[in-house]
């Protein structure tokens, strides 16, 4: 029998400043993958992480 998937899901975090910023260090969009608990965190994640394209700490939001 197959097990159910559980409450932990894999989500993708994308930099919010990479889309609008034109004076970046390099081209592209910074993306990270992480896991979140579906029961404890029902809303979308917003985490400050390092963006190598902007060369600074920026807010990364969960995308679908």
Swiss-Prot record:
<dbReference type="InterPro" id="IPR018264">
    <property type="entry name" value="Ribosomal_bL33_CS"/>
</dbReference>
<dbReference type="GO" id="GO:0006412">
    <property type="term" value="P:translation"/>
</dbReference>
<dbReference type="InterPro" id="IPR038584">
    <property type="entry name" value="Ribosomal_bL33_sf"/>
</dbReference>
<keyword id="KW-0689">Ribosomal protein</keyword>
<dbReference type="InterPro" id="IPR001705">
    <property type="entry name" value="Ribosomal_bL33"/>
</dbReference>
<protein>
    <recommendedName>
        <fullName>Large ribosomal subunit protein bL33</fullName>
    </recommendedName>
</protein>
<dbReference type="InterPro" id="IPR011332">
    <property type="entry name" value="Ribosomal_zn-bd"/>
</dbReference>
<keyword id="KW-0687">Ribonucleoprotein</keyword>
<dbReference type="GO" id="GO:0005840">
    <property type="term" value="C:ribosome"/>
</dbReference>
<comment type="similarity">
    <text>Belongs to the bacterial ribosomal protein bL33 family.</text>
</comment>
<dbReference type="GO" id="GO:0003735">
    <property type="term" value="F:structural constituent of ribosome"/>
</dbReference>
<dbReference type="Pfam" id="PF00471">
    <property type="entry name" value="Ribosomal_L33"/>
</dbReference>
<dbReference type="GO" id="GO:0005737">
    <property type="term" value="C:cytoplasm"/>
</dbReference>
<dbReference type="GO" id="GO:1990904">
    <property type="term" value="C:ribonucleoprotein complex"/>
</dbReference>
